[in-house]
Amino acid sequence: LAGVLICTGNPVISQGKVQAQLQVVRSKTMTVTLEASGGRMVKKASVAGTVTLPSDRNGSDYTFLGWSTKRGQTRNPQYQAYETIKVTRNMHLYPVRYRWSQEPDINVKNLAANLDQYSRIIFVGDSRTVMMGQTLIGQYQNSVSDKVSFICKGRQGLAWMKETAEESLTKALKAAEAEEGATAVVFNLGVNDLIHRRGTEFDYQKKASEYITYMKNLAKQLSGFNCKLFYMSVNPVNTAMKHTRKESEVRGFNEALQKGLGDRYTWIDTYSYLMKFGYTTHNEFRGGLDDGLHYSMKTYKRIYSLVMKNLKKS
């Protein structure tokens, strides 16, 4: 009888082990199916039950924004590229594609002129700022350039800011002292310092720390001028179109800067605005090229408009 009791006890323990093993197997086999531009893609969840979502290419008439459980969504994706999500069940995700034909062509001619609290607005940035300036001056001439100026150069970042742009900005602020009212300075740098080779590790936190340290010191140096400082987020990129930058690192860089700059700078979150409402990557300055980095003139005007609204609220 004792032997029988021993025999009936062991299978129960074994059954519990089998059930536990089955649960582990089930968690490993959770999948996310993505309807990508190149065809259906299936990604298995890791042992931790997570999946990192890929990027996807832009089309000839749309910008890829991210992923959603809803088919046909055109803006404000549920998930963004290179976002790591927890998978508790099998999922089916569809690309969120912003159709270029739906982008409004807004008139921003008088936005700066109507901004009474600032006598001058200075944008400091890289090629994205260059193209925004070219768009505004090309379409509105003196109505923009009389009050708005640009200190910018393509393919530049923090080193250029230290070596060249800082001196140019200081001179511009000294010249503006003769004018009534404060000067608004809007910085938009960082995307070129997030470049790295595909597949290599990149410490964006370290790069963000370098920016934060420098920008805080710069704010102290500029405290003697009648100016207010703003920092515009690094705006969206598409890794599938240009592999030298990753979406998740742009987001992480922005989060670090927004937190680290503190109250010395007013943060302008154009990144979230563009992801929510969409943007166009058909770049007229490069023959309509879509390089996953630069935008259309319509998008540059919308970015400028959002900046002006933030300046007005400050």
Predicted regions and their residues:
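Secondary-structure capping and domain/repeat boundary segments
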Residues: 3, 16-101
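Active-site segments of SGNH/GDSL-like serine hydrolases
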Residues: 192, 220-251
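Sec-exported extracytoplasmic/periplasmic mature domains
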Residues: 133, 137, 190, 216, ...
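Hydrophobic/aromatic residues located in beta-strands of well-ordered beta-sheets
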Residues: 121, 185, 229-231, 267
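N-terminal secretory targeting modules
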Residues: 4-10, 15-25, 98-124, 129-130
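Charged helix-capping and loop-helix junction motifs
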Residues: 205-216, 247-253
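Conserved SGNH/GDSL esterase-like catalytic core that processes O-acyl groups on lipids
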Residues: 115-206, 210
